[in-house]
């Protein structure tokens, strides 16, 4: 199991209602959350005061929540909705029976006033046993600590080689969108019966694949 520095530990149970009572959550999403989540614990507070690192330009605190799930299905859409409204960066440690995984919604501030977040992309590790789950809190400031966490959780899901996290995630999303376009176009070509139209679609496919190289 991941061992957070003693100075960061909170270990405070959080009522499930605390996650959505002040949010505009529709009844269906609220029920999904209730049906999926067994319990929530505020595990750790990662901040300059608890990690002895400098404050970040965009990241000031990372709240670590341990969420015990009732089943293997992760309610990602619910966690994204709630996380978008939370005024801090977060890391979720998910548990189902004896299996664990990490989930982070990579966030960026929506505006210069830092009034709310945009969830750019969600990353999740695979399920594993507690003794095999690891995480290093590396960095001289909170921005670097958060960047290191996201990169560790994302692993090979970040396909860009850019060192800057913002750029790497943005390029990864572009690459994913391009691969989806290629797959959709290949499926369309397979169904097309008119030779001329099939040729035109194939030419489009060649250009898309060139951009994907």
Segments from the language model and where they lie:
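Short, flexible coil/linker segments at or flanking structured domains
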Residues: 7-8, 21, 30, 80, ...
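Extended assembly-interface/linker segments at domain junctions
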Residues: 75-161
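Alpha-helical oligomerization segments
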Residues: 162, 168-213
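N-terminal/domain-start segments enriched in small and hydrophobic, helix-friendly residues
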Residues: 1-8, 14, 115-117, 121-123, ...
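N-terminal, leucine/charged-rich tether regions that mediate assembly and partner docking
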Residues: 1-97
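Detector for Asparagine
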Residues: 22, 26, 105, 114, ...
């Amino acid at each position: 199991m991941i061992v957070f520095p003693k100075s960061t530990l909170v270990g405070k149970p959080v009522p499930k209602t605390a996650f959505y009572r002040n949010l505009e959550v529709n009844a269906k999403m609220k029920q999904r959350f209730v049906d999926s989540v067994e319990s929530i614990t505020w595990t750790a507070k990662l901040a300059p005061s608890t990690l002895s690192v400098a404050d970040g330009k965009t990241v000031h605190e990372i709240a670590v929540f341990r969420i015990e799930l009732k089943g293997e299905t992760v309610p990602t859409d619910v966690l994204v909705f709630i996380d978008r409204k939370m005024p801090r960066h977060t890391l979720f440690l998910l548990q189902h029976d004896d299996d664990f995984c990490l989930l982070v919604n990579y966030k960026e501030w929506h505006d210069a006033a830092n009034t709310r977040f945009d969830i750019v992309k969600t990353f999740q590790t695979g399920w594993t046993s507690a003794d095999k789950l690891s995480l290093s809190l590396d960095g001289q400031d909170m921005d670097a600590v958060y960047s290191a966490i996201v990169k560790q959780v994302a692993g090979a899901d970040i396909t860009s080689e850019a060192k800057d996290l913002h750029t790497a995630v943005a390029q990864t999303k572009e690459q994913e969108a391009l691969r989806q376009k290629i797959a959709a176009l290949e499926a369309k070509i397979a169904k097309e019966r008119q030779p001329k139209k099939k040729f035109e679609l194939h030419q489009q496919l060649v250009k898309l694949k060139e951009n994907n190289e």
